[in-house]
Amino acid sequence: VTDSLDDAGVEAVTAARVLDPARVLVAVDHDTPAGTVAVAEKQRKLLDFARDQGLPFRYGQGIGYHLALEGGLKPGSVAVCCGRHAAVLGAGGVLGLSLPPKELKTALETGTVSLPEAEVCRLRLAGALDRYVTAWDLALHLAPRCRGTLAVLGGGGLDFCQRAAVCGLLAASGAVTALFTEEPLDGAETVELAAVEPMAVLPGNFERIVPASRVDGLRVNQVFIGGCAGGTLEALRQTAAIWRGRRVNPYVRVLVAPATAAVYAQALEEGLVEVFMEAGALVMNQGCSACWAQSQGRCDGGEV
């Protein structure tokens, strides 16, 4: 349960009498610290809900999905929430489902959930991505064939950061959810990773996926490295390796936000944060940060 809920959602979910408090996590991770009085009131209601029923509660410690995985959520588990990025849990082999608030209330009270009826799209990844092709490109490459399905993927040797990017973007582009498995994928379609090219999404929605060559030369106003897929330790290490000894363009706002406090601490220990700051980036607190973009990191209507 997170502060991504709107006011009506908070009222619905906090009315639940929780069946098993140990299996629930309440995480204030989106607007931290609160940017308005209304947001502060919503977060207080979540705190009261957690305290009154003895629920685990985390404030400002990072993105709830990552906190759940750090807390020992095991492959093969089912996790439900109201957040739109629940599929990121699939990077750890967890079936993450996003529910409407009233259905989440029922799940909290009964410990059960009705699984969605969806075609299963099984994909076996083979080979390796080219040097300048990323997991984000892979997700956009797969998006058209995964829309409306439960995507189950295996192979490819992707690390956690890459799997999180694939699962999160597949769900954002229309899949019901997505997850990686170590189990055999009988009848799976094979996807050759070497055939994937750099991709981009044009403003508007994920229906507008194009080869990155279509936007070559596009002027960018703001860059955000963070969120469910970009705030992992692996992503921060990759960024620091590219930036070390370089400076960002002074006319481009560059924001970096680690996914969790544990990731932030490790990034500090490895000197990654120092690299970001010396490059001229703004290092944010852990959490959803500018991916949520409600109280920090917003662009104006004409910016990219």
Regions found by a protein language model. Give the residues of each.
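Fe-S-dependent hydro-lyases/dehydratases of central metabolism
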Residues: V1-V304
